[in-house]
């Protein structure tokens, strides 16, 4: 697993992510390893009203189990197959949300399942907006200890903590 970090947003941006929680839980289902993913994102308009589109990707081997957003907006589902590709089952789920004034907040959450771990190779740290706080959690049970995480391109500002609970 590779984890990448991207830069570009600043705390002066109008829309910021005040908190993001992104968890990945390794499990076995009928003897096959899968990864359950839950992502919860809180947004805030810091200067004026603005539109935003929280989104997540899914497809044949990554199911979208639930999507929700506070503050209005209905989930939309679209195919994102690139041109000149014979077959690609890539899809996106997104919300069209509007924060109507400074200080307005909203939240979005997505639940996905990676049914084939060949498609669980990267976790991106960056988001579309400046991130005030983000926590990634990976839970790997002892029965799946053959899976390992590899951090790549971490800046000194990123803190990585590993722990083993009583279950191993």
Segment roles from a protein language model:
Residues 1-3:
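Sec-dependent N-terminal signal peptides
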Residues 7-168:
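Beta-strand-rich, non-transmembrane domain signature
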């Amino acid at each position: 697993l590779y984890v990448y970090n991207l830069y570009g947003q600043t705390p002066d941006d109008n829309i910021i992510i005040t908190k993001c929680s992104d968890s990945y839980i390794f499990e076995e289902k009928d003897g096959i390893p899968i990864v359950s993913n839950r992502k919860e994102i809180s947004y805030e308009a810091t200067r004026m009203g603005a539109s935003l589109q929280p989104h997540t990707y899914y497809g044949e081997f990554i199911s979208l189990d639930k999507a929700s957003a506070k503050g209005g907006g209905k989930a939309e589902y679209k195919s994102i197959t690139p041109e000149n590709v014979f077959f690609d089952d890539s899809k996106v789920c997104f919300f069209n949300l509007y924060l109507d004034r400074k200080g307005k907040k909203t939240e979005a959450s997505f639940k996905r399942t990676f049914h084939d771990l060949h498609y669980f190779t990267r976790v991106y740290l960056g988001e579309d907006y400046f991130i005030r706080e983000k926590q990634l959690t990976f839970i790997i049970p002892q029965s799946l200890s053959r899976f390992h995480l590899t951090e790549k391109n971490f800046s000194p500002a990123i803190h990585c903590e590993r722990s083993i609970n009583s279950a191993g």
